[in-house]
Amino acid sequence: MSHKGHPYSASGAFFLDNPIRRLIQPPSELIEKLAINPNDVAVDFGCGPGYYTIELAKKAKRAVAVDLSSEMLKKAQNKAEKAGVMNIQFLQSNGTNIQLEDSSVDIILLVTVYHEVGESEAVLKEFNRILKPESKLIIVEVIKKGIFHGAPVQNPEALKAEIESGNCKLEQMLPQKNTGIFFFTKKT
């Protein structure tokens, strides 16, 4: 599976969080499918301007917004403050060294981000470190061409094989418009 390793520029944050996207792809629609427990710690990896972070935080005990870009994190933090959502921790990381305790996370969510991860093997190892046993890694990627996604189309079988090599098992894949929601569980 090819990875660009080029994160989305903060100058394009408007395209990640705008009224048209909210009509077509409301963040609450995806978050409802995740079955988040009120005691969960949920990570929004590659959070960008916080499009999904706020909804995660509303469902979970605590949300952790992780992004490589300090500019994106500032946008997400400003958005959280305006929304009055205070249970979010903001961390800058490329994913190879996330400043969280071992086995402290219930859910890691990546929405059209995994294809941008440069060091996927190291990132999967880090996810494995911070995930609790039998917790969830949820990856949303484009699996067929559509008019609203600029992200490259991913091969579902290649994605499954790569993630499963990182100590996770695919439990379910839900097609949603032109994306696939891949639910992985950390192996014990």
Predicted segment positions?
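Conserved SAM-binding loop and adjacent beta-strand
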Residues: S11-I31, A151-V153
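Class I SAM-dependent methyltransferase SAM/SAH-binding core
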Residues: V43-F45, P49-N97
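A short SAM/SAH-binding and catalytic strip from SAM-dependent methyltransferases
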Residues: D106-E119
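Conserved beta-strand signature within the Rossmann-like core of class I S-adenosyl-L-methionine
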Residues: E134-E141
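Core SAM-dependent methyltransferase catalytic element
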Residues: P175-T188
